């Protein structure tokens, strides 16, 4: 994300590529969104806010803080992807499935290491707090 919002355009440019639809429980998705993306849009970073607002309004929903509307839009988006993506290129995947479905779709062996758990809410909040820090001067490095 946010590139996933442009999957039709990306797939048009790379028609042989697989489309990985990452799904999760709608309530879990909302909890993550309301703890990461929504607070970030309310931050003082105007560039971030403009990007999120434009993306949500053009590709998703304008009522970003409306839980029910956002969940409905999330679920409708997943239905739309499943209905419009070429079945031969679509991989529907949930993080708890790990490497298996992705590696199978790509005809690759499953790595001998656990599937990474990254981009958590705490990771996002740390990234966001670092973005909100003033830039370091050359003398601080």
What do these predicted regions represent?
Residues 1-35, 41-92, 97:
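PAPS-dependent sulfotransferase catalytic domain
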């Amino acid at each position: 994300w946010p590139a996933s919002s442009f999957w039709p355009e990306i797939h048009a440019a790379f028609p042989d590529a697989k489309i990985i639809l990452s799904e999760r429980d709608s309530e879990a998705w909302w909890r993550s969104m309301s703890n990461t993306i929504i607070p970030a849009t309310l931050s003082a970073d105007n560039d971030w806010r403009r990007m999120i607002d434009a993306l949500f309004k053009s590709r998703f929903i304008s009522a970003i803080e409306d839980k029910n509307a956002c969940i409905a839009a999330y679920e409708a988006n997943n239905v739309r992807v499943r209905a419009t993506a070429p079945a031969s290129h679509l991989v529907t995947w949930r993080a708890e499935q790990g490497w298996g479905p992705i590696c199978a779709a790509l005809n690759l062996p499953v790595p001998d290491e656990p599937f990474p758990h990254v981009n958590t809410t705490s990771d996002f909040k740390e990234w966001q707090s670092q973005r909100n820090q003033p830039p370091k001067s050359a003398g601080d490095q």
